């Protein structure tokens, strides 16, 4: 009896050992190919009928029970509908732009000055009062990448720098005039073939070294919209979709007064709404200024989120709060009035506030102490 039990136990152990060896030596199943992954992703989104439905469309169907739900048969169609439904439904509550602040990003691609197109928007009445200061400071070092967009002929300005574009737009500070200039800026950038488009106003100082570092951390072929919103929530607008139909739309936008940048990859996708005069008609759909229209095209129509960057500064913020020890890291600065007080960065330098109310000359000497007109004994 004992011998029989022992024989059975040995046979059971041998069988278990053989099964383990077969499992260990068997080839693992091959990983799914990309197309199969796509089909599985679509199946995971499918309802009982086996047909995938884009998120956001279910909510729309629930709001209108009789409305048909669009069927999705491929990943590309799914993401297209996802973008469209995001535009229609609006951003989720508390949604915010992706931040670019924090530790420096690794370099994605080295950039040369000729890779960047900086458009400076101005008007003829400010050629002397504002542009002369920029030409004396940061533009003097970076004429190759800077293009001035104005609304009137100025032979003296044209002789001083070769990159002056008379847009023939109105000199009024109106929604239509601002959009007219932005339309010309966009078209000139596309024609230039450069990698990055950056827009600033004539009251901005651009720290080009910091700008190149920032842009170099993003591939220009990807969809990148960099800037700083002036609002703490998405702007709400009314989008005209036909003669008798409007609908609400929500989106973030980077304020033009602080400057913003757009990659070439994204700018090319904006073409149906921005090129060849389409920008002005797009602006009329929401009846908002040029910088808002940029945000509308990028966020609401293309579904690309704004990347918030605190290194851009406008006169709408308290510039006294920018630490003097971090001025070399800032991409743009500004000046003006804030709460009925003079608003400029706080920096010690060779020029008094009376002689340098914008503090741009002092900032320039801080960044470029070898400038010929900067005092050699300057203390910052």
Swiss-Prot record:
User: What is the membrane topology listed in the Swiss-Prot or TrEMBL record?
Assistant: Single-pass type II membrane protein
Q: Which of this chain's residues are annotated to bind substrate?
A: 130, 202
For the site labelled Cleavage, the residues are 87-88
User: EC number(s) on record?
Assistant: 2.4.1.222
Keyword set, alphabetical order? Developmental protein, Disulfide bond, Glycoprotein, Glycosyltransferase, Golgi apparatus, Manganese, Membrane, Metal-binding, Signal-anchor, Transferase, Transmembrane, Transmembrane helix
Q: Tell me the Pfam families matching this sequence.
A: Fringe
Its annotated compartments are: Golgi apparatus; Golgi apparatus membrane
List all topological domains (Lumenal). Answer: 30-380
Name the reaction it catalyses: 3-O-(alpha-L-fucosyl)-L-threonyl-[EGF-like domain protein] + UDP-N-acetyl-alpha-D-glucosamine = 3-O-(N-acetyl-beta-D-glucosaminyl-(1->3)-alpha-L-fucosyl)-L-threonyl-[EGF-like domain protein] + UDP + H(+); 3-O-(alpha-L-fucosyl)-L-seryl-[EGF-like domain protein] + UDP-N-acetyl-alpha-D-glucosamine = 3-O-(N-acetyl-beta-D-glucosaminyl-(1->3)-alpha-L-fucosyl)-L-seryl-[EGF-like domain protein] + UDP + H(+)
User: Where is this chain compositionally biased, Pro residues type?
Assistant: 90-107
UniProt-recorded Gene Ontology molecular function terms: metal ion binding; O-fucosylpeptide 3-beta-N-acetylglucosaminyltransferase activity
> What does the record say about how the cofactor binds?
Manganese is the most effective. Can also use cobalt with lower efficiency. Has some activity with magnesium and calcium, but not zinc.
The entry marks the following residues as binding Mn(2+), namely 203, 315
What InterPro entries is this protein classified in?
A: Fringe, Fringe-like_glycosylTrfase
Q: Is Ubl conjugation a UniProt keyword of this protein?
A: no
Which cysteine pairs make disulfide bonds? Answer: 169-180, 198-261, 365-374
Q: What class of enzyme is it?
A: transferase
Q: Which cofactor does it need?
A: Mn(2+); Co(2+)
Please name the catalytic residues of this protein. Answer: 291
Query: A GO biological process this protein is involved in?
Result: regulation of somitogenesis
Cytoplasmic compartment ranges equal 1-8
User: What is the top-level taxon of the source organism?
Assistant: Eukaryota
* The keyword tRNA processing is assigned to this record: no
Entries under PANTHER family matching the protein: FRINGE-RELATED
UniProt lists the family membership as follows: Belongs to the glycosyltransferase 31 family.
- Protein's UniProt name: Beta-1,3-N-acetylglucosaminyltransferase lunatic fringe
Tell me which species this is from: Bos taurus
Its taxonomic path starts at:
Eukaryota, Metazoa, Chordata, Craniata, Vertebrata
Q: Which gene encodes it?
A: LFNG
């Amino acid at each position: 009896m004992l011998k029989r039990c022992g024989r059975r136990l040995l046979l059971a152990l041998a069988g278990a050992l053989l099964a383990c060896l077969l499992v260990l030596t068997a080839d693992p199943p091959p990983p799914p190919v990309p197309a199969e992954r796509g089909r599985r992703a679509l199946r995971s989104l499918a309802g009982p009928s086996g047909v995938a439905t884009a998120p956001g469309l279910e909510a729309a169907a629930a709001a209108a029970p009789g409305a048909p739900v669009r069927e999705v048969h491929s990943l590309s169609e799914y993401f297209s509908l996802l973008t469209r439904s995001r535009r229609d439904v609006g951003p989720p509550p508390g949604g915010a732009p992706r931040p670019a602040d924090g530790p420096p990003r690794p370099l994605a691609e080295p950039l040369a000055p000729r890779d960047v197109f900086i458009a400076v928007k101005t008007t003829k009445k400010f050629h002397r009062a504002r542009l002369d200061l920029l030409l004396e400071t940061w533009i003097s070092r970076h004429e190759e990448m800077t293009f001035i967009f104005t609304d009137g002929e100025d032979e003296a300005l044209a002789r001083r720098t070769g990159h002056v574009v008379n847009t023939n737009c109105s000199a009024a500070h109106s929604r239509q005039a601002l959009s007219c200039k932005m339309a010309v800026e966009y078209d000139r950038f596309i024609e230039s073939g450069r990698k990055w488009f950056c827009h600033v106003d004539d009251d901005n100082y651009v720290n080009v070294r910091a700008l190149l570092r920032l842009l170099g951390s993003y591939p220009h072929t990807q969809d990148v919209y960099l800037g700083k919103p002036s609002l703490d929530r998405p702007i709400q607008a009314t989008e005209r979709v036909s003669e008798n139909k409007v609908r609400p739309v929500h989106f973030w936008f980077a304020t033009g007064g602080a400057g913003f940048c757009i990659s070439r990859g994204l700018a090319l996708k904006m073409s149906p709404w921005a090129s060849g005069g389409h920008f002005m008609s797009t602006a009329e759909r929401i009846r908002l200024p040029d910088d808002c229209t940029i945000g509308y095209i990028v966020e609401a129509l293309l579904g690309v989120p704004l990347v918030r960057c605190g290194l851009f500064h406008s006169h709408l913020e308290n510039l006294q709060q920018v630490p003097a020890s971090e001025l070399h890291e800032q991409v743009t600065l500004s000046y003006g009035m804030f709460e009925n007080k003079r608003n400029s960065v706080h920096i010690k330098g060779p020029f008094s506030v009376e002689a340098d109310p914008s503090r741009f000359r002092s900032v320039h000497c801080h960044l470029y102490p070898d400038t010929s007109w900067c005092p050699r004994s300057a203390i910052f």
